[in-house]
Amino acid sequence: MRIAVVGTGYVGLVTGTCFAESGNTVTCIDIDADKVKKLSKGEITIYEPGLEKLFLRNLREDRLKFTTELAGGVKDSLLIILALPTPPGGDGSADLSAILKVADDLGKIISDYRVIIDKSTVPVGTAEKVQTAISANCKAEFDVVSNPEFLREGFAVEDFMKPDRVIVGTGSQKARKIISDLYAPFMRQDNRIIFMDERSAELTKYAANSFLATKITFMNEIAILCEKFGADVDLIRRGLGTDERIGKRFLFPGIGFGGSCFPKDVKALVKSAKGVDYEFKILQAVMEVNEKQKLSLVPRIKKYFNNDLKGKKIAVWGLAFKPNTDDIREAPSLFIIRELLKEGSQIAAFDPEAMANTRRELGENIELTGQYDAIKNCDALVIATEWNEFRTPDFDKMSSLMKRKVIFDGRNVYELQKMKELGFYYESIGRKTVSA
C-alpha cells in the first residue's frame, strides 16, 4: 500500500518506518524543513532501540521518503495517517489545532477515496471534528478512522511489530477491510484487531494510559505508608504482583511518572470529564500525588544537609523520564534539578542518551559529563532514571571518587543489604534508610 504519515515525531517516525518495513511505500510529511532534510540524509532524529536499523534499510530501499509538501506527500496515498502533537493547553485540554489545520488542508487536496487514520491521542469526538473539517472543502468520498497508538518508549519497535492489540474505531466496512489488510503482516499468529466505534477507540487510549498512571501512583502512596510503618515496598510489590488479578507490571514505586503521554493524557481526560459535567476525582488525585512525588527526594536531601545546599555538589544519574529513551518531557529529574539549583547546589549529571535534550532544556546551568566524572567530589548522588548502566556500577570507584558516600535513589536500583555492606548512606523509596 501507499501510505502518507503526517508528522515525524516519535509516533510518526516509528509508524512510518515500521509500515515501510512490512513492504509498504511510505511518505512522511513534516513542516520542519531541517528535520526533513536530516531524515532524508539518513540522520535519525530520535533515539529508540532498533529503530535506526529499520529506518536506514527502508530509506536505502526507497520505501521510506520524507517531504515538507502535504499535497505532494499524500498525492498517491490511499492511507493518510495523522501523527501530530496534541499538547496540553493552559487548562489541561488537548490542543487539536495541528490536527484540524491538516484536516482542513486535506479537504482542499483530496479528490478520490482516502482513509484518514488518526494515531494521535485525542479527546472523544475528534474523529467527528476531523470529518467535519475535511468535508467543508471536499466532495470526494473518505473515511476517518481512530487508530490510537500504544507504543512504549524504549520498546516502540517491538510493540509496533508485535502488538498485543490494535484498536480501530470505524463504522465503515470499506475502511475496516483496508485497515485489516494493513495490519495483516503483524497478525500472522493471532488476529488481535479490536474494532469499535470512533468515540470508544478515542476513550480507550485515554483510559489505558490513565489506568497505568493510577497504578503507578497507588504504589507511590503505598511506598509512603511503608516509610511511616517501617515496611518494605519491594516485598509488598512482590506480594501484590503474584496476584493474577493485579499483575506484576507498573508496580514499581519511584519519583513519579513523566514523559509525553501519562501526564498529558491524565490532565486531558480530567478536562474532558469536566466538559460533560463529571468530576474525575481519582485522576485528580493521581495528578496531585504525582506532582508531589516528583520532588519527594528534595526535602530528604535538604534534611540530610541541615537545609543548607548552597555550594553542595549533587550528582544526578539519569535524565530521561525512563530508560531506553532520550525523551525528557515531564522528566522527574528536571524538576529535582531545578529545585536543587534554587537552593544553590552545583549539579553534575549523566544520562546515556538524554544529555543533548537536557542541554537544550536547561542550558549551561548544569554540568553534563560522564557517569563517573559526574560523581567526582560530589556531596551526594541522586538516581533519577533506572538505566541498566546504573545497576552494577564500580562501587569501589564510586567510593574513591565521591566526597561523601551518600545516595538518594528515586528508582530503588540497589539492594539495602548491599549498600550497608559497602558503607553508603542510602535513601530510597518505600524502604528503610541505610545509615553509613
Q: Where on the chain are the PLM-derived regions?
A:
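Structural/interface elements that position substrates and couple domains in central-metabolism enzymes
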Residues: 1-436
